[in-house]
Each structure stands twice: as structure tokens, then as C-alpha cells.
A protein has these predicted regions:
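Charged, low-complexity intrinsically disordered terminal segments
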Residues: 1-107, 111-445
Length: 445
């Protein structure tokens, strides 16, 4: 709710520009409400630049073309498909697999070059507590000051790269009538479901402080926004990539390394790094999704391959549960929750919040971005978030049994209950996930 309020408020207060960079912008309630805020800003004379990855825009061309028709709005798509719909788009995915497999996973909302929201959220109901079934727990950082210039420079690099193509150059169709689209957005924002959601946003105490300009910022001189380059996969030079920069933070001796990653596939190198830290006396902890909470079971299969090795090496693993008291409650009362936060904190002093999953896809295929900080106050807050996620009410502690089996400890009951298989899953889901783990697809996870 607060994340929605921050974006809506920044759009309403913008006077010059809105630069929006996202992997996904869903055709749903939240997507429509924020699109209406963007349109309203453009109507006031604000220049809007919207950069979306093209992998999830199927069926959105009419609406995007309509927005692009506004004189103050320009829409570009990253690494777009030449075929815009139907079976031809699917065939192109097969024919150009190695090319279209590289996606822009960045997420940034920048207003007037003065305020930036950077983190792990896409735009859609499940990212803003408005989904009836599953909502994602996610984390953003709201930035003011010099760090915003970093985010703006990253946006400009992507916007001006050859990978970002104006949507009007891709689709010869006549754009949907802008006035018709605006009328539809206005009608939806006035209906009962939208009003219930907007009422919940307005009732949030922190959202009220935000809109009343009562939030007190935390000032720090040690915050930077970092990103992969737009053409990440072109050439062998990895010096500008985000992954080596993040890995460098794990080098050396540490007291504590705490990781939060919804999609956790450490691979051989990452596993060796974490085990090396644990052997050296570092407390290493990881919070990730359980199989039941993971919306991509194939990714869980990649994690499963390394889980026992990490446990045997002294790494603490916690898996977020899906049901019961762990669930958040969206517009219609969601039945579950899934972790989507991507962050780490080291020695209670420095850390990262962004879009980077600890998996091969983030490391090698997608472009990613996030906020790096060296600040005990911010690190303390992020460490508290880790501890909250790892707490008994939200997650299962994973351990090895006396017989060498993998066990899940439900610490929310007294006495704690020991589970012998993946919690809240069917035999079929466990079996298919195990079968997927045998496939040579780790590089794509």
C-alpha cells in the first residue's frame, strides 16, 4: 500500500519529468490506476518516458500506442519482438532464443530527477497488496539527493541504447483512441473495487505521512545506485556488470552475511563462496521461498540441488511459507504470499536492495539494478527485515535430520512440528520439481 502511495504521490507532485523503467506493467487494477496517474501528469505538461521490457507486453500494444500518442508521453520497448502477437511471436521466440532470452529486469520510478523508487517491484496487483490469491512481499528504497542522479543516468543509458525501440516503430496498427483509453481508466478508478483499494491506501498511516510530507528521510553520504549496462551480453568484458560488484562485497572476512532472494540458485561458485564464508566462522543465513510459495517451481528445482550441501556446510536456510498467518490480505483477501524481496546485509553495516536474484539468470542473462549502501542505520533496518522474514510465523527452518534427510521445522507450533517433505505441497508438485532438477537448464534459471 505504501509503495503504491509513494508512486502515486510522486507522479502527482512531478513538475517536469517522469522516467519509468520496468520489467512488467500488468493490465490490471494497479496497472490501470498508476497509468492514470502517469496520464494525469502528462496532461499537466510533465514529460513522461516509459521503458518496458517487451517479454510481458503481449496484448498491450493498443493501450501503449494510445499513451504514446499523447504529445508528452513516449513509450519504448527493450529488446522487442518483431512480431507483435499470435503464433508468430511464439515462433520468433524459438528462432531468436539466444537474442530474446536477454531481458531488462530493472525497476525504477524517477520523478523530476529528484525522487527515485528503486527495488524489486514490478507494476501489478500482486506487488501492491491488491491480488485476490497471492501477494508478493517486496522492498523498495525511496531515494532523494545525489543517488537519484545515479538512477537517472542509468535510465538515460537504457533509453538511448539501441536495445530500446520506440513502440510506434514496431507496430503499424492505428493506436487505440487515447480519449477512449482515458475514459476507461477513469471509469475503473471510480468503481467499487478500486475505491476499496484506494481507501485502504489512504488509511495507511505511513501513506498518510507521505502525502502530508511528514516522512523524515534518513540522510547518508554512502548510497549509490548501480546497474548492468544496457547491452550486458554484448562482448566478454564483465567489468561493468552488477554481479562482480555485488560479489566483491562478499570477499574478505565477515561476521555475518544475511541474504534474501525469492529465486535462489547459487550454482557451484555461489555455493562455494557461501560455504567458504561459513567455514571461516561467518554466520551465513538465507531466506528464500518454499516450494509452495515459489511461483516458478523450475527455479526451486535449481535451489533444491544445492540445499543439502549448504545445510551440511553450516548455512542457515529459511523458506517462506504460503498459507495461514503468513498470508497478506489483499483487496479481496489473498490466500497466500510469496517472497519477492531481493537484498543482502553484511555485518550490520552495509547492504543491497534491488532487482538482482541470486541465480544465474540475474548474473548472466538479465540486466539488473539496485541500491548499494554503507550505512549502519539502513543496515540495521534491513537486518530487522531479514529477521522478520526468518521468524517462525513466516518461515520454516530447514535442517538435516539424524538420518541425513531434509526436514522442515514449523516453529509456529508448540512444540515445533517436524515435516519430512516440502510443506503445503502435493506429491505431484514435488515429483515434477525433482524431475525438472535433472534437466540441464540451470543457466536459464
Amino acid at each position: 500500500l505504501d509503495a503504491f502511495a509513494a508512486r502515486a504521490a510522486s507522479a502527482r507532485l512531478a513538475g517536469r519529468s517522469l522516467d519509468l523503467q520496468y520489467y512488467m506493467w500488468h493490465d490490471d487494477l494497479v496497472g490501470h490506476l498508476l497509468a492514470r496517474e502517469v496520464y494525469a501528469a502528462a496532461e499537466r505538461g510533465v514529460r513522461v518516458r516509459l521503458l518496458l521490457d517487451d517479454i510481458n507486453t503481449k496484448g498491450l500494444d493498443p493501450a501503449l500506442l494510445a499513451l504514446d500518442a499523447h504529445p508528452n508521453i513516449e513509450v519504448r520497448l527493450y529488446n522487442p519482438f518483431r512480431n507483435r502477437s499470435g503464433v508468430w511471436r511464439l515462433l520468433e521466440m524459438v528462432q531468436r532464443f539466444f537474442s530474446v532470452n536477454h531481458r531488462m529486469h530493472n525497476k525504477a520510478w524517477i520523478a523530476d530527477g529528484r525522487v527515485a523508487l528503486v527495488g524489486g517491484r514490478n507494476i501489478g496487483d500482486e506487488y501492491f497488496d491488491a491480488n485476490r490469491s497471492v501477494n508478493f512481499r517486496d522492498l523498495d528504497m525511496l531515494l532523494l539527493g545525489p543517488a537519484v542522479a545515479d538512477a537517472s543516468a542509468i535510465f538515460d543509458d537504457f533509453w538511448n541504447s539501441s536495445a530500446a525501440v520506440p513502440i510506434e516503430a514496431l507496430n503499424p496498427q492505428t493506436p487505440e483512441n487515447l480519449h477512449r483509453l482515458v475514459a476507461a481508466l477513469a471509469h475503473e478508478s471510480a468503481d467499487a473495487a478500486a475505491q476499496v483499494y484506494l481507501g485502504r491506501v489512504a488509511a495507511s498511516p505511513s501513506a498518510q505521512r507521505l502525502t502530508n510530507h511528514e516522512l523524515v528521510p534518513h540522510w547518508s553520504a554512502n548510497i549509490t545506485v548501480a546497474s548492468d549496462p544496457p547491452q550486458k551480453t554484448k562482448g566478454a568484458d564483465r567489468r561493468g556488470w552488477l554481479q562482480p560488484r555485488l560479489a566483491a562485497h562478499l570477499d574478505g572476512m565477515h561476521r555475518e552475511v544475511l541474504l534474501i532472494s525469492p529465486y535462489f540458485v547459487p550454482g557451484k561458485q555461489g555455493t562455494a563462496t557461501l560455504l567458504g564464508l561459513a567455514r571461516g566462522g561467518t554466520r551465513v543465513g538465507v531466506v528464500t521461498n518454499s516450494l509452495a510459495a515459489n511461483d516458478v517451481p523450475a527455479v526451486h528445482s535449481g535451489y533444491e540441488r544445492y540445499r543439502d550441501r549448504l545445510l551440511d556446510g553450516g548455512v542457515s536456510l529459511f523458506e517462506i511459507g504460503r498459507h495461514g498467518p503468513v498470508a497478506t490480505h489483499g483487496l479481496f483477501g489473498s490466500s497466500g504470499a510469496s517472497l519477492h524481496t531481493k537484498a543482502f546485509v553484511i555485518d550490520g553495516a552495509r547492504g543491497f536492495v534491488g532487482s538482482f536474484n541470486l541465480d544465474p539468470r540475474s548474473a548472466n542473462l538479465n540486466t539488473e539494478m539496485g541500491v548499494l549502501f554503507d550505512d549502519p542505520g539502513l543496515a540495521r533496518d534491513l537486518r530487522q527485515e531479514y529477521l522478520r522474514l526468518a521468524a517462525p510465523v513466516l518461515s520454516y527452518a530447514v535442517r538435516r535430520g539424524a538420518d541425513g534427510s531434509t526436514q522442515w521445522l514449523d516453529r509456529s507450533t508448540q512444540p515445533p512440528q517436524v515435516l519430512e517433505h516440502e510443506p503445503d505441497t502435493s506429491w505431484w508438485l514435488r515429483t515434477t520439481t525433482r524431475a525438472i532438477s535433472w534437466l540441464p537448464i540451470e543457466s536459464q534459471l
